[in-house]
Amino acid sequence: MRTIAIDAMGGDNAPEAIVEAVLKAKAEMPDTKFLLFGDKEQLRKLIPSDQINDQLGVVATTEIIADEDEPVKAIRRKKDSSMVVAANFVKEGKADALLSLGNTGALLACGIFIIGRIKGIARPGLMPTLPVQNSDDGFNMVDVGANAKSKPEFLLQWAEMASYYAEKIRGIQNPRIMLLNNGSESDKGDDVHQAAYELLKDSDLNFQGNIEGNELLLGKADVVVTDGFTGNAVLKNIEGTSSFILHILKDSLLNGGVMTKLGALMVNGSLSSLKSKFDTAKYGGAILLGVNAPVVKTHGRSNESPIYFTLKQVDKMIKENLVQDFKDEFATK
């Protein structure tokens, strides 16, 4: 039976939304065990007594890593936090994967320092799936913040892992790989990006060249590789812009005149489609590529739906032996 360790105390809607998602996933995934780490009393109140069985368990912890905690200090000092205890279960082989909605930096630290890097991987990278305008498939972008500074060989390894993920987990044949840069020409960018371009071009990947920031959502790439500093800034920009657009539309329609509101009723289906396009819940969470087990981060504001989809994503990663394939591949390099 596959086992997912879940930090039940991380995120704005914890533990209620997490328990709701787990109960829904449990009913659909009979070969998967869910271990919830957190305040035992709170969790027991939320879980019907008949649901506690071989497929669902609670591991009592007494501490929580808060969003404002300094990541590395937090995982060292809060040994009995829900996140750290869950990470140690994965390290010790008592669980196959770790999921959290909590402090991103602390989760990255748990992945790197507790669960550990895959032999042969220079630096793990954080990878979400983001929407595009002409497809429901979206695209993967890595790294979006696990590393402040990057070397060309880091970007090559991230591209290799992301390409394999896109093919095996998302079902995309021969994924198109592109390098985020400040121009489409091969000589664009600083020394790191120029060197990364050459490494990607000489690899066995389906490398399609550079991509600029204004093209990211056009569906030109299945995987976009970038340094962590730039990737994090771009990710926040995409999230902020989508939120801004939806807010402006909603405000205009609700505060407009009678004719505006009548018009809104007529285009309600199109507006719902637009909102759905920006909704990344169906893609699951962001993956820390390059560590010894699946470590996945879901947005801290998530409700039941994105958590549920992330549980399905994590389960598929375990089922498909994704991390073991990475270990086999990079051990020989």
From Swiss-Prot:
It is found in: Cytoplasm. Signal peptide: none annotated. GO terms for molecular function: phosphate:acyl-[acyl carrier protein] acyltransferase activity. Pathway: Lipid metabolism; phospholipid metabolism. GO terms for cellular component: cytoplasm. HAMAP family: PlsX. Belongs to the PlsX family. This is Phosphate acyltransferase.
